[in-house]
Amino acid sequence: MKKIEAIVRHFKVEEVKDALNAKGVQGMTVTDVRGFGRQKGHMETYRGTEYAVEFIPKSKIEVVVSDANAQTVVDAILSSARTGQVGDGKIFISDLQSAIRIRTGESDDSAV
């Protein structure tokens, strides 16, 4: 199994969700996060005072899939989240040792 974590722009979450649903992904977790990469930060003005925003708000999408479906899910995220601009985000792929569905006790691929 693979855990796929994607950091994407907020306005791309629905598009990514729809792309993943079309590929058969049945569940995901979405979290509001803040961070920076090459995009760094930006300047904003509030009540006439300019200040630096160092951490950019993004959304983190987490999906657990079988090894066989991992590349399909990554491709769906890439195609739906990309704008071509700095700050589109990142995808992280990790091996997942085990997963257990609490309600039934099913484990591993049966649990996802």
Model-derived segments and their meaning:
Residues 1-112:
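Positively charged, small/polar-rich N-terminal and surface patches that mediate targeting and assembly
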